[in-house]
Amino acid sequence: MFVSRKAFEAVLGFDENIFTSVLTNFRNIDEVSEKYGKFDFVLADLGVSSMQIDNPERGFSYKKEGPLDLRLNPKAGRPAFEILKELSKEELENILVENSDEPYADILARNIYSFIRSGMEVETTGQLYKIIDKTLNFIEDKNRKDIVNKTAARVFQALRIEVNQEFEVLYEFVEKLPHILKPGGRVAILTFHSGEDRIVKKTFKEMKNSGVYEDVCRNVIRPTKEECHRNSRAKSTKMRWAIKAK
């Protein structure tokens, strides 16, 4: 959803003297800082919005039929179904492993690749889900449906990360943070899967050891049971923080 700054601020009830909205990518944080100055505090929420997930036209969920798009910004980049057509079996397997730790990456990559090369269309969420379901037909566990759904969720996550270059964006963002924070400035980052958390944890630790940060989060912060009850999508959330050296 795209709205004008004036409309957004009118809904909030205050203007840009108090709150300024900027529509941009995390990797452009340095450009925002150049315009508005360095920050005392940065809170980065890396999650996909519920509005995007629940919109079948965006293709983020296997639960709803729609185009296999997966772009966070539908006006930029290329949809997932186009990228899938150009991937080798090895490239697809690597994406599934690196982006979602997928245990069935080998057989899934082989079958998805074979389906596409045979001329079958894989352009909708439903078509991809059917391939995943057929690939795992060897599973006879009573919880097979649950296993298939969890696998589908990981596959969609892996493709979304690839389509939007989310890891590359995150690497750029965390590398630029020290340059846009004031001395003593703080940053908190909310991640939603292990790949993101590993990047944040590793970078914060390295920068603390080099003296960039005076302190970093030692133990990841998780939502309480009450928070998860109010918002089930918060279950996978992890938060890490860091304080820039003065």
Regions inferred by a protein language model and the residue ranges of each:
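S-adenosyl-L-methionine-dependent methyltransferase catalytic core, i.e., the SAM/SAH-binding region
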Residues: 1-246
